[in-house]
Amino acid sequence: MNKRLKLEDNGMELDLEQTMEKVLFEVEYHKNNYFEALENKEFDKDDFVETQKQFYYAVTFFSRPMGVLAAKIPTPELRLEIVRNFWEEHGEGDTSNIHQNTFAELLNRMGNVDKETVNDTHLSPYVRIFNTVLVGTCTLEDYRVGVAMMGIIEHMFSDISGIIGRGIIANDWVKEENMIHYNVHETLDIKHSKDFFDVIEKDWNESAHNKYLIKQGLELGAVLFNNLYEDLYKSRKNRY
């Protein structure tokens, strides 16, 4: 176990970052069947592309609950952290760099899948569950729950982007020089995650109730995102 997580065993309370690490350690998302199959070159290419076509709908939706959440942040200074993230999700005004467009281009390079084909793909119940929980939490729950949930998903996606990007290249589905989207998010989402956690850092230190809300969001986000990939792998043979 990470040495930082052992602090809790010694009676020392974990800070926000350490709590996030503890949650991720317990979820064990690195052992997810989706990533293990990709790393072990046991993932059929057509099945993988199909799961990524489904993930496209998660990419296109992700900024929408973020926009709802930004409106709930109590101060403009903290709100800017989320607004900046929202703006970057939209390519900072450059439509070619909007994240759903770079992901669509990756699908084209990897599987010769054009955007029209992707848009004609029916949404799986697993992606709908993911998207609905995101927007429901950001709309109805305390903003601290939503911020923590979105922050840990961004943190996980930075790591997951590296895993998937390397897996795509190792399987020779896309050449390294032609990789797009995942190589950007491997580094960008570290910053995005920090933006979210900066919003709730002060809240974390103010009260036990705030800690409870934030822990709820961290656990929800980690379990939700890990389950999405497990469900995508489980349904990889389906063609929606």
Residue ranges and their predicted role:
Residues N2-Y240:
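Non-heme di-metal
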